[in-house]
Amino acid sequence: MAIAHASPGEAVDVGPLGSRLPGEKIVALFKSEHLEVIRLVLTAGKSLPPHKVPGEITVQCIEGRIDVTAEGRSHVIGPGQLLYLSGGVTHGVVALEDASALVTIALVK
C-alpha cells in the first residue's frame, strides 16, 4: 500500500524518531511539480550508494550523524546542520550513527 503524501497546508512531524528509528523506512513526505521532500532514515553503517539528481539538494540532519560524500569530499553533518549540493553532483551517504535527515530536491524538468 502506498503512503499518502502530505497535502498543501498540512503539518508533518519531522522531529527526531529516537527509539523508533530502527523500525522506520525512507519515505517521501511530499512531492509537487517543483519540489520533493524525503525523510531519510539510516541505521549506523548503512548507506546510499553514489547517485545524482538534476536539481539542487539540501540535506538537513535531524538526529545522529551522516557522512555525505560529494565530488570526492566528505561532509559530516549532525543535528541542526544543513548541507547544500548543486544539481547534477554525484553524492552518497553513510550513517555514522542511527540517523534521520530531511532531503529536499528541486525537481528540474
Task: Give each language-model segment a name.
Residues M1-H34, T69:
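A short, N-terminal "cap"/entry segment at the start of jelly-roll beta-barrel domains
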Residues S47-P49, L83, G87-G92:
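Histidine-centered metal-chelating micro-motifs
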Residues I62-E63, G78-P79, E97:
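A cytosolic small-molecule/anion-sensing beta-strand core signal
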Residues G23, E36-V53:
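Conserved short histidine dyad/triad with adjacent acidic residue
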Residues A44, P54, R73, V89, ...:
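A generic "binding-loop/recognition-motif" signal
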Residues G72-G87:
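Short acidic-glycine-tyrosine-enriched beta hairpin
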Residues V41, K52-D67:
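Short, conserved beta-strand element in jelly-roll/cupin
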Residues G87-K109:
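Ligand-binding loop in jelly-roll beta-barrel domains
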